């Protein structure tokens, strides 16, 4: 912990700690609100996808560093969800299931559409 040299330093350290705690509280509240909302869960999953969290980041060139930076953002977000506790983790899992279901349904619709198009050409 930071040890104050002067009274002003001590006061500044207390102020910084209080600001940090308030920002953390607001971040946690916002993240939980996001997880409790279906559209928020969708957005969360889109952002996690954008970070490449479940992808191989190695390219064999300097793009690897960029990809790892994006991936680190996703890992940070997952860590913050875990810090919120079991309810947040369950909501994240719900988001993952909703996301997979949506992707499967979109694929089904695309296959149906292309099958109809191919059938109408004949």
Task: Cite the ranges covered by each PLM segment.
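Intrinsic-disorder/low-complexity detector
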Residues: 1-122
């Amino acid at each position: 912990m930071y040890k104050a040299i002067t009274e002003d330093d001590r006061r500044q350290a207390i102020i910084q700690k209080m600001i940090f705690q308030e920002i953390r509280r607001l971040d946690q509240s916002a993240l939980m609100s996001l997880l409790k909302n279906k559209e928020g869960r969708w957005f969360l999953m889109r952002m996690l996808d954008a970070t490449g969290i479940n992808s191989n980041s190695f390219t064999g060139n300097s793009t690897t560093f960029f990809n790892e930076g994006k991936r680190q953002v996703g890992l940070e977000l997952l860590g913050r969800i875990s810090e919120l506790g079991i309810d947040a983790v369950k909501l994240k899992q719900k988001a993952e299931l909703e996301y997979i279901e949506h992707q499967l349904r979109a694929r089904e619709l695309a296959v149906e559409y292309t099958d109809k198009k191919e059938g109408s050409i004949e």
